[in-house]
């Protein structure tokens, strides 16, 4: 009686169990996508909370509109090329993290049994939300330039009709890849031709420390829904994210959000707006984040190449939070390495967790975001003791 | 392409539009269930926010467990008769308002096309969540003692098998009625016999200023899921609620919550825990709330009986936030009175908004929670100018 289809579809809680295990202080976790605690701007958040409750207690504590706090919606619109549009905020829905945005838009745009295309491997949280919604998944291959849009085009040519194509175009989770400019143009053209929606889940785009960002998908086609979040640039515990979408899509999502949770916390929306919109704050904070993550990424990649270079290949990230390492032993199974790794005091996420159709047994996602350099060294030493030498 | 079945089912946004209209300052709104702004404990919340960010910034700002902040879960368990259970918090899921709890448990326990029984009239937010989930609704009559459990028993005897029976057993929204002790016993016995779950949505139980509360349903059968909220006893803008449920149900809801929004804001959970668990705070604040709402209820009922006693009957509430007034003109349609009422500067919610199968045209829900005495007088004067004399 207890488990409905929705619960069954949402699947196991293996990742949640893993993240709980890695909360043990003796384990160095490369598993989660948690910001480095030292980067959390606690003082700015405390000032914003105090100011919101002092200046606008009713706005922070009373029921608010389902669409979100209007100044935050305006700020988000401005960051997404809508600054000149007097009704730009009509494109914006504030959500309880971008996870909720994905869940709402899936339910708003895809009926159960409908089709969603996405890269294989794909973000675990997206897989959970999509599977819980009862949609079918079309797994598209991906490489260092992101989703293989040619392969998607072939599937479309055979008559497959996804309602959505989901991408993390900037610093993909788990693969770290960025969708190339050429593929963005091609993907946008396919969206216009076949009438599907592109969901560009973009929590990491601001965390680029090297190279130029390709043109955003939203500038290439109106059939783009961009998801953003305060989790990686401010603090995940606030649970504030957003969707920027065509107004008709935003309205459909709003209807579902009203029955899902009425609205996102008015207080945390005010905190996010007061910090992110404070002149100079975000630019300065992004410099801190990029510098921190670049240093940690270079440290992790360097240590992995030094101590495990004979056993894995490790790409050099230009941004984001993840390295998608590949074991050179083609018979390896990273899922079977996890228990010994945790026993040795280090955690990662095995490739299988991100599998849509394939298991990615030679892959492991390693996050350099959370741990400092000394902890990263310790983690690599422990990994080296667990991954068999060639 | 934009509107899925889920959006269609979730229905129109008439109530949201109404609540937006009533934000205009020249309108006295008896429409929403918003706490009187004067009762919001802004200082206590500001102190709690500052303390959380000072004492436990990581706990307030980093990702947290999907189940919720453990000290808050323990506190909720203690308020629900589980203080002596060393694992009492395992029964508790913290949610983004009790609205989310209802949505999650519906998806966890009822597949699309399954049956949910509830009183007609019923809470609008419940109707939206249930309809969005695609479940069928069995409308059960209700009277001044709440859901007519005999009528439910008759339906069960004919072979109908609801997966859930939804009640607001204390100070129902919209009817204001409290489910009698006898009916609680009978409902619990039916749950045990037929194996359905009782959802006892209880945001108003603490707002009782007269009489004794009947025994809680959770003490009568283990097949009870109790929903609670900080919205009415603290502040709705925090969006913190909870479900207290058998562990297997709590686990199924947790799986769906993970894909819905990962977890509820860690900061607002800490604020709610630090205020509600502070010795003496809640007891004192509930005295303030009960005194305020009792005075406002008596003021509204008195004014309605004085100025509209020839046109409506008005029950005297013992708690909660709502009066479910009945127009004496049996041909009246409260939905048609709304536009002239808003034009005259007063808003209410017409009975039709709460209809499951019936339209309740002679009914109107009037909230005395938000407005002070002078505004309530103004509202009644304006209503008297709109409701036709006999």
Language-model features: locations:
Chain A
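Conserved core of the PLP fold type I
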Residues: 59-194, 205-223, 293, 322
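PLP-dependent enzyme catalytic core of the Aspartate aminotransferase-like
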Residues: 343, 358-390
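Active-site PLP attachment segment
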Residues: 206, 219-252, 264-267
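Conserved glycine-rich beta-strand-loop-beta hairpin in the small C-terminal domain of fold type I
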Residues: 291-301, 313-326
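Short, conserved charged micro-motifs
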Residues: 331-337, 374-378
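N-terminal small-domain helix-loop-helix segment of the aminotransferase-like
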Residues: 8-97, 104, 278, 347, ...
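Conserved PLP cofactor-binding pocket of PLP-dependent enzymes
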Residues: 27, 203, 342-365
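Structural signature of PLP-dependent enzymes
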Residues: 253-258, 278-302, 330
